[in-house]
Amino acid sequence: MAVAHLACDSQGSVVDLSGQGLQKLSPTLPFGNDTQTLILDKNQIIKLEHVEKCRNLVQLSVANNRLVRMMGVAKLIHLRVLNLPHNSIGYVEGLKDLVHLEWINLAGNNLKIIDQINSSTSLQHLDLSDNNISQIGDLSKLKSLKTLLLHGNNIASLRAASACLPQSLTILSLAENEIRDLNEVAFLAGLVDLEQLSIMNNPCVMATPSIPGFDYRPFIVSWCLNLKVLDGYVVSQKESLKAEWLYSQGKGRSYRLGQHIPLVQYLATVCPLTSAHGLQTEEDAKLDKILSKQRLHQKQLLHQTRSDGYLTSSTPNKRLPLSTEHHSPTHVLQTEPTVQVNNWLRSSSSEDHSYAVRNICSSPFGPPHYSSLYMEDIQTDEDKLNCSLLSSESTFMPVAPGLSPVSPTVELRVPAIKADLPVNETVIEFNKDHTELPPSETPEKPKLIPGLSAMQDDKSCCVYPVIKDENVTENIINCETAVSMESTQTSNGPTCHNLIMNCKQASVLDQDVNHINKISKAATKLQSCWRGFYARKYNPKVKDVCYEIRLSRMQEHIVFLTEEVIRLRKEKEEDRIQRILQGEAVRYLWEQVQAIQQWQNTVKLQTANSSENDLPSASNSKHANPALEELPSSPEKLNRKASPDIPDSGFHSVILNHCTMGNTEKNSSEESEYSQPSLDTGRHYNDKVPDSPADQDLTREEQSQSSKDSFTSEQDSSLLQQYLRSVEQLDETADNTSYSERTEESRPEITTCSDNSDLSCSISHFLPENSKQENIDIHSNLPSIDDGHNTPIPCDSSLLVPQPDLV
């Protein structure tokens, strides 16, 4: 196993065993009592063993391993720095005796609670980010704690912050948690020394489609009054003024816990989110006006102090500042626009990490304290709206100077000049391409006016804005105002001449600035077009994004086509089922039609057989009953009654002749009562007096066949009910007509027939079976009604062959 070499420095020995594939620590490893720094990063260590022999160990780093417990550090009582990120540690232990600990990093573990850290009273930095902590533990005994990083956890409430967090806390990171109510920020009001706070990427500050955009920064500043940096951006003067207004006159502190939606709606009205300069509200315009007046007043005071002799003519290379802001160590007023500061790393080196800084011009005759100025990475409001910095990586974690984020509009910042002079915190930018005027055109400036000499000596280092052209005009107006104020103090001729020349130079400067701004805009547009083309063609990340967009569109199209295919398939299935039902219905109707045709053929055959059987029975009754033929009646009228006009429908019904059994004065109801015995008598006579045995058998077969046919026809009788009703109506009409005619023309014949019928019926009813043959002889001996006609006219229509009841 390879062992890393020992590297000793002035502070003691350093043992670096990172990336060696170690799974455990053996006693033979090269570290002893003199080891002060031990680095075991990027190994496979599960348990810390044999590190207690390093009694003087001050710094220990075991990052990116497989540690489950941290009890192995319990005996390292001199330990000051403990770095254990990205392991599998479940709970904090072994820190009870480590009273000298100042820096602990436990990020990226499986911690759920904060415990056993109160004993490390010297702790200043505690990193518990990217764990599973759901609530803030008790850290009130850590009086020296300055930095607490809790981003990337599951914290949903800050109720315990005022009681569990120490008052000395200056940096607090709560980003990427589960805080859903913006009113939870009120519990941070007790942290009076809090200067930097991060609350980004929480549900309470994230934009939603149902809620209009709002700026939460003034509301948080209204609770944390000493806050200087929020979410990685410096709190601007405008935000401070809005926070003061929310605290004093607005409703910022009137909302309580659980009223997140009303608070957000209120902030959307008083602090709307505007990303462009042309979308400023009326309140923003008023604030800008107030701040501009404040800067103008400060300029006037500066000029007044210079004219009084604060700045003499012996310092001709001093510049006229564009804006000056006084500040105290406890409260610093930042100038507009809002800037982003990485204030963990401040380097005095001359390395330039920003491509927006054109040139740094300094006068060789300037004071020596300008050489001690240093640069910081700053960012304007436009970059703040377009950036996606995570506080856990870019804001609260130190990075190397060469890897610091670069902003396209980074400017030079001068935080301090000298203790005995007002501090200038104006964001300025120098242009090295500015051409100086020829010396011949510059008039000789008198030494009586120090302000003018300072202005004219400043031509070699011109100030240009980055964002707005209005700033240049305002600066020129301020310059003219300052010149006019100083001109009132003198009355000589050269001073007026110098004022005129200064105004001309200001106008020329304005034209040059406009021309340069146009060129800059054109160059920026060309660069943006080229960068877009290059990114789309050669940048792998952009190509991957374009590929993902194409895949997403293709997926959406496939989903749409799938839905269409499913819909068409359902429609086709419904059409198929409908066609099947229609086919079944047509088949059923065809079967019904076939059944009706078969039944019609059966009825026709039955009718034909009945008509053939009627003829022999009628002839037999004529020969057997000659006396009945002699009854006085009109054959034409009887035939007209027996066969009325019935439409030929294929279903012939036999009309029974009812003989009247009473006098002509009786009504139709009495005649119907007498017709029933006559019908029974006729049937009885027909049954008892057959012509021959063969005819009797044929009659019985026909009756049984007709009964079967009638039973079969009952199933389809409903189809003929309407037709038979119409036939019955015609029959009743014909019966009434024929009956009225017969009663008037042949009343004696009907009476005689009725008497004879009653006599024969009564005789046949009371005679025994052996005497019924004699009754037949009696009827045969009766005289014929009409010898001239061969058609037999029976007394009752029941003598015919009975037909089946079709209804």
From Swiss-Prot:
GO CC, any one term: centrosome
Keywords annotated in UniProt: Cilium biogenesis/degradation, Cytoplasm, Cytoskeleton, Leucine-rich repeat, Repeat
Pfam families reported in the protein's UniProt record: LRR_9
Biased composition (Polar residues): 607-623, 704-724
Organism lineage: Eukaryota, Metazoa, Chordata, Craniata, Vertebrata
Function description: Acts as a key negative regulator of ciliogenesis in collaboration with ccp110 by capping the mother centriole thereby preventing cilia formation. Required for recruitment of ccp110 to the centrosome.
A biological process term (GO) from this entry: negative regulation of cilium assembly
Organism: Xenopus laevis
Protein name per its UniProtKB record: Centrosomal protein of 97 kDa
Main location: cytoplasm
The keyword Repeat belongs to this UniProt entry's keyword annotation: yes
Region spans: Disordered: 306-330, 607-756
Coiled-coil segments on the chain, per record: none
